[in-house]
Each structure stands twice: as C-alpha cells, then as structure tokens.
C-alpha cells in the first residue's frame, strides 16, 4: 500500500512540474488582409509613406513585397540602445501588395512585435501594441488613400 501511495504522489509531482515547464503561449500573428479599390502603385506609395511616418525604414522589391526594419522609437543616437537592451518592445512590418485588376488591389499586412519584461530579459514574440497593430496600420493607409 505504501508503494502505491508513493507512486501516486510521484506521478502527481511529475505532472505538476511538467505543466509548469512550458513557456507562455505564443501570441496569434497580427495579420490583416484587405482588398482596396485603388491601383497597386498607389497602394505601395501610400503604404511606404504611412510606414515611413510611423518610424520604419521601408524596402520595396519588384514582386510587390514591402518590408521594414525595426521601428525607430526615438529620433536620437540612443535609439539603437532601446532596440538592443533598454527598450521593452520592437516592431517590424511585412506587406504583400498584389494587383487584382487595374483598379483593385489585395494587401496582406503582418506586424511582428517582440517584447521583454525588463533590461535583463530576453526578447520574445509578444502581442502587438494597438498603435503599431496591423489594424491601425490599415486604418492609417485607408486615411492616406482617402477611403474612410
């Protein structure tokens, strides 16, 4: 009887420890897909302007892909320190612009956000803050295109 009780206790202990071994769940990807009644070139130009105004450096290729570097949090030489060690969040954007026809464009925009708890924490995928979210970037793009 004693071995049975100790076996059950060991099983419960191992189950409890295994349940605590995993990290926090990964956040869902911050992705939005929209169809805009605007030509593709106009969407690319407006999206580049919106992202540049938001503090991103924008790169475009001929295939319709728009990517950014990490968002500039402050306009000073200390911005690199924020992205490297002292900040608590950093964001970048990837977008795919596909022309449907002459006057309609499909846009897929994804925002990647990494965060940490403090100076000595490590960067992990995190939920995107609302000002940098994909939904807000789409809203700003629609404002720039005068669709709202």
Where in the sequence are the language-model features?
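Bacterial N-terminal signal peptides that target proteins for export
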Residues: 1-9
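C-terminal motif of bacterial Sec signal peptides marking the signal peptidase cleavage site
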Residues: 16-19
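Ser/Thr-rich, low-complexity intrinsically disordered terminal regions
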Residues: 21-148
């Amino acid at each position: 009887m004693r071995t049975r009780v100790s076996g059950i206790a060991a099983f419960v202990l191992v189950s409890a420890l295994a349940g605590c071994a995993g990290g926090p769940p990964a956040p869902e990807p911050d992705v939005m897909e929209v169809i805009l009644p605007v030509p593709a070139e106009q969407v690319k130009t407006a999206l580049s302007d919106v992202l540049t105004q938001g503090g991103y450096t924008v790169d475009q290729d001929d295939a319709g892909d728009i990517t950014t570097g990490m968002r500039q949090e402050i306009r000073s030489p200390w911005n690199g320190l924020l992205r490297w060690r002292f900040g608590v969040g950093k964001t970048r954007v990837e977008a795919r612009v596909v022309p449907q026809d002459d006057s309609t464009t499909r846009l897929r925009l994804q925002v990647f956000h990494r965060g940490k708890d403090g100076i000595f924490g490590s960067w992990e995928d995190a939920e995107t803050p609302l000002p940098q979210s994909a939904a807000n970037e789409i809203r700003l793009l629609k404002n720039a295109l005068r669709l709202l």
